[in-house]
Design a protein with these regions (language model features):
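Glycine-rich loop(s) and the adjacent beta-strand/alpha-helix scaffold that form part
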Residues: 217-307
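Aromatic pocket-lining residues of Rossmann-like dinucleotide-binding sites
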Residues: 62
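A short, basic/flexible loop-to-alpha-helix module at the beginning of a structural domain
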Residues: 31-42
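Conserved small/polar residues in nucleotide/adenosyl-binding loops
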Residues: 344-351
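Conserved N-terminal/central alpha/beta ligand/cofactor-binding core
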Residues: 14, 35, 68, 74-189, ...
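N-terminal secretory signal peptides and thylakoid transit peptides that target proteins
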Residues: 2-18
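Beta1/beta-strand and adjacent pyrophosphate-binding region of the FAD-binding site
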Residues: 40-52
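N-terminal Rossmann-fold NAD(P) dinucleotide-binding loop
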Residues: 55
Length: 351
């Protein structure tokens, strides 16, 4: 290995170590004692951090229940990564399957998940998906989401076709109609360019948050969470609770490499640029216990010549993987089970 490559590797290691140290410090200092807050700028029943699928659903449910809700989104538009994802949703034992004679069951779905998840799944949560997925489909349809009619996708890792395909082709097919419903609720306030900074604690209880209004995300910074100081700080009291729906950290070059050293800073991502670990780090600092953070998901369908998700995925995923074969262009030989789970197909593509 050349001296230049060694120097570059050492520099990346040093940078990651420094960032890890800063993040550890941020986590250790997470949480502001409520006694130090002289006066709250705002007061709501529920404060939601993030505006993707989870945040939107929470805002709608709480808002329709008559609660006063504040939803904070750090980016200039709502939706987060949910707005640009593929939008397909697996729902075992659904009416479309029944009409088409597709035999599915709770046991088969859980077995598929356990196989793909290497047995690390929380089975009680898988059961909850089976119990509630049809309610979820009805919920988003009632909001105005439209699925491809009478159609089930047969996606990798599943034993039978069980996934609904959104007509819009992306998660925007859910986000837009859900947001339209939220805008009808006068008791729900949505703020964009509003970045969560910290929790306000009364003992072990989260009673509010601080955030910055007028924040401007800066993709040119190595770590926007650590370096960006834009915006005016506000304090908000949450009388009933704070909902964390800030999404993943696929664009956080330091945090993701700490979890999986293979994901170097030059590794591209299909996620929107604001998918960083700032909220997660603060949550860890006050004792949150997320599970299996190091199990990152790779997507084997994308084109390295395209930025992010690209458009080639529409062919590779829905045509090649479903109806064709994948071959090594150097040997012309097939080298994977095209219908296997993402973990298997991603590892096969990387070899």
């Amino acid at each position: 290995m050349s001296e230049m490559n060694l120097c570059r590797r050492n520099l990346l290691k040093a940078g990651a170590a420094a960032a890890a140290g800063i993040m550890a410090s941020a986590a250790a200092n997470a949480g502001i004692p409520a006694a130090k807050v002289e006066k709250y700028d705002e007061e709501y029943d529920v404060v939601i951090i993030g505006s993707g699928f989870a945040g939107m659903a929470c805002a709608l449910k709480a808002g329709r229940a008559g609660k006063k809700v504040l939803m904070l989104e750090k980016m200039p538009v709502v939706g987060g990564n949910s707005a640009i994802c593929g939008g397909n949703v697996a729902c075992p034992v659904n009416p479309v399957q029944k009409a088409q004679g597709i035999k599915d069951s709770r046991e088969l779905f859980i077995a598929d998940c356990l196989k793909d998840g290497l047995g690390l799944n929380h089975v009680e949560l898988l059961s909850k998906i089976v119990d509630r997925c049809n309610d979820t489909i009805k919920f988003v349809e009632d909001c105005g989401a439209e699925f491809v009619p009478n159609h089930m996708l047969f996606e990798g890792g599943h034993s039978v076709p069980r996934s609904y395909e959104i007509k819009a082709g992306t998660g925007s097919g859910y986000i837009h109609p859900m947001y339209d419903q939220i805008k009808k609720l006068s008791n729900v306030t949505v703020k964009t360019r509003a970045k969560f900074d910290d929790f306000i604690l009364d003992g072990d209880a989260v009673v509010g948050v601080t955030y910055r209004e007028g924040y401007r995300f800066n993709a040119k910074l190595q770590s926007d969470d650590l370096e960006n100081k834009t915006g005016k700080t506000k304090t908000v009291r949450a009388k009933l609770g704070v909902m964390l729906a800030a999404g993943g950290f696929s664009r956080d070059i330091w945090f993701r490499q700490i979890q999986d050293p293979r994901v170097v800073p030059t590794t591209d991502s299909t996620n929107q640029l604001g998918a960083t670990a700032g909220v997660l780090v603060k949550s860890l600092g006050i004792g949150a216990a997320p599970v299996q953070l190091c199990w990152l998901q790779f997507l084997p369908y994308t084109n390295p010549r395209e930025k992010g998700f690209g458009v080639s995925v529409n062919f590779t995923n829905h045509a090649c993987m479903d109806f064709g074969i994948v071959v090594d262009r150097k040997t012309g030989k097939r080298f994977m089970d095209e219908h296997a789970c993402l973990l298997y197909t991603s590892d096969a593509a990387d070899e």
